[in-house]
Swiss-Prot record:
Chief location category: cytoplasm
Cofactor binding comment, as recorded: Binds 1 zinc ion per subunit.
Comment block on domains: Consists of three domains; the N-terminal catalytic domain, the editing domain and the C-terminal C-Ala domain. The editing domain removes incorrectly charged amino acids, while the C-Ala domain, along with tRNA(Ala), serves as a bridge to cooperatively bring together the editing and aminoacylation centers thus stimulating deacylation of misacylated tRNAs.
Pfam families: DHHA1, tRNA-synt_2c, tRNA_SAD
Binding site for Zn(2+): 565, 569, 667, 671
Protein name listed in UniProt: Alanine--tRNA ligase
Top EC class, one word: ligase
Amino acid sequence: MKKLKASEIRQKYLDFFVEKGHMVEPSAPLVPIDDDTLLWINSGVATLKKYFDGRETPKKPRIVNSQKAIRTNDIENVGFTARHHTFFEMLGNFSIGDYFKQEAIEFAWEFLTSDKWMGMEPDKLYVTIHPEDMEAYNIWHKDIGLEESRIIRIEGNFWDIGEGPSGPNTEIFYDRGEAYGQDDPAEEMYPGGENERYLEVWNLVFSEFNHNKDHSYTPLPNKNIDTGMGLERMASVSQNVRTNYETDLFMPIMNEIEKVSGKQYLVNNEQDVAFKVIADHIRTIAFAISDGALPANEGRGYVLRRLLRRAVRFSQTLGINEPFMYKLVDIVADIMEPYYPNVKEKADFIKRVIKSEEERFHETLEDGLAILNELIKKAKATTNEINGKDAFKLYDTYGFPIELTEEIAVQAGLKVDMTTFESEMQQQRDRARQARQNSQSMQVQSEVLKNITSASTFVGYDTATAQTTLTHLIYNGEEVSQVEAGETVYFMLTETPFYAVSGGQVADTGIVYNDNFEIAVSEVTKAPNGQNLHKGVVQFGQVNVGATVSAEVNQNDRRDIQKNHSATHLLHAALKSVLGDHVNQAGSLVEADRLRFDFSHFGPMTNDEIDQVERLVNEEIWKGIDVNIQEMDIVSAKEMGAMALFGEKYGDVVRVVNMAPFSIELCGGIHVRNTSEIGLFKIVSESGTGAGVRRIEALTGKAAFLYLEDIQEKFNTMKSQLKVKSDNQVVDKLTQLQDEEKALLKQLEQRDKEITSLKMGNIEDQVEEINGYKVLVTEVDVPNAKAIRSTMDDFKSKLQDTIIILASNVDDKVSMVATVPKSLTNNVKAGDLIKQMAPIVGGKGGGRPDMAQGGGTQPENISKSLSFIKDYIKNL
């Protein structure tokens, strides 16, 4: 067998199947495009669902890809095994109703055994099949010539994830020899068993049945092939190394970790786990961020945050106690660059995000210790065991390692209820597994639409009307020849001016009619074979297939949609100009009355940034730039600087919407002929929609004017209420009122201080000596959170050499503040005091050594927290 680099295996695989007539499908972004059923792209076939379920027809029925993927259903196993990963590449060849078992098996055998390709020894290959799949057996045995002893029948060789395509599969195994798997159970020592000797290198799925809702199976009209070969695993076989982590995909990362930590890989098993966790997770994190995901507290962002925190935790076992993961990004970029240049292009941004997250997590670890200390106190007072649910919450919510929880508990003479902890973990795994199974199921093929292949030409770029012929009617899921008045119907036209919903732009509406009937068109979508599929209600008459009709788009709405779509392009370019090149479109909606644009960015825009973007767009509108639209090949388009939307798939010929030099973008939508037609652009809101995604909503033309007119009316009302005559006086009047309010609040604050002082009496008498320190620990009665700080300032001026800790209950919320004289901060730190107290009142806090503050939601525990902090100081 040849010893090949991973990049060579990938290229050979693609080249082989191109020779066999396959079309290369580029690797899609990890963040799914137009697929809400998936959190991540999690397999090679995930991006091809649209072809398998019949929604779209590919240019070629034979497809090959190398697809990056993320799976996080068993994160806790990564690092402890030889081949578990959260990020991996899946090589796959697919047939959509073209070749089937015979060719799929022959292709696989040729690629693996031919000296031109992988050059594997035929006598080291074994296969598994489903017991009832005699067709696969005969191909392997009679055509390939594989001995019967090397064909293993396994009941589990049937690919079925619920409703949708399913079928038997055959897996190919490579025998690595007796040196591997010596510690594995004898009963598992066979291809398909749990062992290290026989490694699965390829899985061929023969998708020939539909799994129906009633759990019956019916033959698919078009049989499909779906195969998967893990690149990391194949690299480990080709390079003859024990685990995936010793391949050239990982070893440069391991070498860098060795430099940073001073530890060696493959010397200590416990440390090796940390090496593998870090190496795996940094690949996932770097690629996910490069594809538009950002750390957050939910969804994809939560997965990233969890992975990063897990890697940081394990790095501490290597003695790394400072941010360093971000330094590995360049290594990942160099390894993957030949096929995935995106990580290198965005490396600076990725490093910035990761470093910020690392710094935050080092602070989180401190918070976790404070919570754990409370759990230890609670356990000592009750069962001498830390509750498993509490330990799981500490692990799952705060990212605190269960191993560290156990270690600290043992040192305190306690144990952790691991049975309950493991139960909680298993429930989480089950939820993730179920979600994965649900998300991977495909739709049942739509045969009615799929079988309609007659052409339907879109002519709406140049006109809003057309004389055309009605070619197909679909009613209640069946193709019919006529439909009566009042019914909802789907139909196709030989030529149509109606734009189908696509690229964020809504569909046109309008009417299709002749002397005998009229249909009000409400929706237009793309059929599987690319035709525009119209939906409408028959207003009067009887609709017949073959009728000659007039098709008219609602031109008022069309003009407004054009304005908003062209403005969206200008907005995208302006955002990149103001915020940076990391901005990518994450979604858009172009309607007649407004536009909405989602984009990747890691924080809210400032008012100044919003103003800059708005000004840039309007300047381009007022310049009156001609909008030139051309069709050209994709290479020429990119050479002229056309921006391709992130994650969008394009054909060989593309449509370029050119508003040069400001915006040049690939787009199939409808646009104005000159930017001056947009008239006016106004941003009305900027908000967050999720992890690292911001949303701008904006208006153009008449809608923008009416919006500003409404604001002007409200401004005039405010001017009247303030009793000023000119616009310029409004700000002065508001400033005057604010100054008067501040003066009144200051008077109230002083009065509150005086009242508090009277209530407290002589505070010097309340100072205690604890462990050699002068300490004032007390609850104060104040009207608001701000007042506790002013009270502290007052006390500090009188007790300059005293540690002061104050707590208050304001509206059932706890506020607390601590100060420590600077001369004492080497021994006592205000931040530590608050961190110890805050969890007791159900909150958190921190700050500097000399000043800190915090809060909580359990005012009933204020007395308990004050007593605790006295004991804490006593034991310093």
